[in-house]
Regions:
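Phosphate-ester processing/binding pockets and catalytic centers
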Residues: 1-195
Length: 195
């Protein structure tokens, strides 16, 4: 089985997920808003990353300033005649303005500075649970292995032990898998940059 994770997208969605506490009425537009934020960040990566670094994202201390800077950046481009104004992007901007006034974005506060994703092991365990009849061979990842060693997965009260970690240089199948994953990564990067 193959699974791909867009690290940038996954690192951004906590901003949008933090907004549901104050804007539950817009939950139906969740995917559109997340997509608009992702597309905007792809288009204006350097400027957004600068804001993230200055605010030690995802450990934002001054939520009001963080939200105001993101809002100003969106306003500067979303109102530009060269940039097609986007409903979801404007909705995000308005929601961020409110969050800034409340000084609250719960999922991007009180985290380790600059640590965008801490729990990669969840993606591994998810595969093991979804495909519980399969045996999963993962390339050695020491941090993930340590986290998974403390877990017990069950299906119908029966423990799951359908995974193992191996050194890629010792397993030809993992080497081939790494090669294919590398090619797919290049394809996805190309698609991100050209679509």
């Amino acid at each position: 089985h193959y699974s791909a994770l867009n690290n940038l997208y996954y690192s951004l969605v906590d901003i949008v997920d933090s907004l549901w506490e104050t804007h539950p009425q817009w939950l139906m537009y969740m995917w559109g808003i997340k997509g608009a934020l992702y597309d905007f960040v792809i288009e204006h990566q350097d400027e957004v990353i600068d804001i993230f670094i200055r605010h030690t994202y995802p450990n934002v201390k001054d939520v009001s300033a963080f939200c105001n800077e993101i809002c100003s950046l969106i306003w500067g481009y979303n109102d530009d005649s060269e940039y097609d104004p986007d409903f979801f992007l404007e909705l995000l901007r308005q929601m961020l303005k409110t969050a800034g006034k409340l000084d609250k974005l719960i999922f991007v506060q009180d985290n380790e500075p600059f640590m965008l994703i801490q729990e990669y092991y969840i993606f591994y365990t998810e595969r093991c649970e979804i495909f519980s009849k399969s045996h999963h061979i993962f390339d050695e990842e020491l941090t993930v292995q340590k986290q998974m060693s403390n877990l017990e997965l069950y299906e119908n009260d029966i423990p799951l032990s359908n995974w193992q970690f191996v050194k890629s240089h010792e397993n030809i199948y993992v080497q081939v898998s790494d090669l294919i994953a590398g090619l797919l990564r290049k394809l996805f990067l190309f698609l991100d940059e050209n679509s």
